[in-house]
């Protein structure tokens, strides 16, 4: 009767009233009821491969948002459960047992924009945007990087000039993932070029359908075009879409990036085999490629499995830390490095196991192998993550920054 009462609460869209009291088995039973009752799509695809099916992801999120299962730490009124950090970890562990649709198109909204809005957004912004993000109704992209501002993110040149209660934006962004799907973008812009580069920035939300916004997809070597260039020419936005105070854009950006590295909020589910086989599905896929499994091959798989497990634990620890403290720390950088290493290891082993067939498009690991090099760049390069760990964890001296106290306009003219 307890679970039936919970289901009725989900049907009414009120969420789970006792989420922090649920046991692991009760959570597992409830999620199974929801996914089975709703006939949720059970396809699972690798990031960047087959993730264009928006309908399946939207159906899954629309189902889970009624109980706040996908972003449980968010407030109930915004699509969550108001769950504790400990209960969130428990829900995440159970959710990874289920095979769910690829949520790659929705990950920025769920894992980065949502937490930033909860920390820096106004009440009106949270009401307008968070529930739509949690339900999959609204997709967001991240407009940070520029042709001359990648790892040096604070060097952004896209300008925002205030005109009454509006802002006029102009400039270019690049490597904007999910732009072709997105209804909204979170955009870092320069509002005061007379300030040092970190201080003259402000964060905005921009409708991607706005006049003056042009999206040009960038084809990658794995034949995906999930990254884009975005050109902004005289686009006008309301001051109500400014996120945080004027000149505080860098602080908001650091919140976004910290949650990106920690992987907070952007659960994509698991492989569906954890309870039965006690092994992730990529191991089973590799086993299909080889008949007589040599001891050397088994040792490689065992090593990768250990690294993969450590990667997931590190990411979970970083995510838990972010939620419990309200401010993601440098642990997210360690999680990002481990995740990249694990992804590359799995991809390269799958490709080498396939032998000569691994050079063909239909081979297992082909797309992943072509995607792997980009993993060390996207979301902050490996070098940036190591700098963060060196300075904030090991206490090593930071790199000299001659432009820290010089106005951005002077640094751009080469006056330092």
Question: Across the structure, where does each feature detected by a protein language model lie?
Answer:
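Amphipathic, small/basic residue-rich leader segments at the start of a protein or domain
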Residues: 1-108, 125-128, 132-135, 294-302, ...
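Glycine-rich beta->alpha junctions and the first turn(s) of the following alpha-helix
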Residues: 20-22, 213-312, 375, 411-416
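Internal helix-loop-helix
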Residues: 65-136, 178-184, 308, 315, ...
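Alpha-helix capping/hinge segments and adjacent helical runs
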Residues: 81, 333, 337-416
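A short, Trp-centered hydrophobic/proline-enriched beta-strand micro-motif
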Residues: 136-144, 188
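A structural signal for short hydrophobic beta-strand segments in well-ordered beta-sheet cores
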Residues: 158-161
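A short core secondary-structure module
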Residues: 165-166, 170-218
């Amino acid at each position: 009767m307890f679970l039936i009462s919970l289901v009725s609460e989900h049907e009414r869209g009120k969420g789970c009233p006792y989420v922090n009291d649920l046991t692991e088995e009760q959570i597992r039973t409830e999620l199974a009821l929801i996914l089975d009752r709703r006939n949720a799509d059970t396809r699972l695809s690798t990031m960047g491969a087959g993730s264009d099916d928006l309908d399946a992801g939207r159906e899954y999120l629309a189902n889970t948002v009624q109980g706040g299962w996908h972003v449980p730490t968010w407030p109930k009124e915004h699509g969550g459960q108001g769950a504790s950090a400990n209960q969130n970890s428990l829900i995440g562990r159970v959710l990874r047992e289920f095979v769910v649709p690829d949520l790659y198109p929705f990950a920025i909204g769920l894992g980065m924009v949502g937490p930033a809005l909860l920390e820096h957004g106004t009440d009106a912004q949270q009401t307008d945007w968070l529930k739509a993000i949690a339900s999959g109704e609204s997709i967001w992209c991240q407009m940070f990087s520029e042709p001359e501002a990648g790892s040096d993110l604070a060097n952004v040149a896209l300008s925002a000039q205030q005109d009454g209660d509006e802002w006029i934006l102009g400039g270019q962004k690049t490597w904007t993932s999910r732009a072709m799907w997105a209804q909204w973008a979170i955009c870092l812009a320069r509002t005061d070029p007379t300030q040092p580069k970190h201080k003259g920035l402000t964060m905005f939300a921009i409708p991607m359908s706005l006049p003056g916004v042009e999206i040009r997809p960038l084809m990658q070597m794995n034949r995906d075009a999930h990254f884009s260039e975005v050109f902004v020419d005289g686009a006008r936005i309301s001051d109500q879409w400014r996120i945080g105070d004027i000149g505080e854009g860098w602080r908001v950006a650091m919140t976004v990036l910290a949650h990106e590295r920690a992987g907070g909020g952007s659960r994509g589910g698991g492989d569906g085999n954890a309870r039965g086989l006690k092994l992730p599905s990529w191991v089973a896929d590799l086993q299909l490629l080889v008949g007589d499994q040599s001891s050397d091959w088994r040792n490689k798989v065992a090593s990768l499995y250990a690294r993969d497990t450590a990667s997931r634990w590190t990411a979970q620890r970083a995510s838990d830390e972010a939620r419990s403290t309200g401010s993601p720390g440098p642990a997210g950088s360690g999680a990002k490095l481990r995740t990249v290493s694990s992804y590359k290891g799995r991809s390269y082993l799958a490709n080498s196991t396939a032998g000569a067939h691994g050079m063909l498009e239909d081979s297992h690991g082909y797309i992943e192998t072509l995607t792997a090099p980009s993993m060390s760049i996207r979301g902050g390069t490996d070098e940036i993550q190591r700098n963060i760990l060196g300075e904030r964890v090991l206490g090593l001296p930071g790199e000299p920054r001659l432009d820290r106290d010089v106005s951005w306009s002077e640094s751009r003219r080469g006056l330092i």
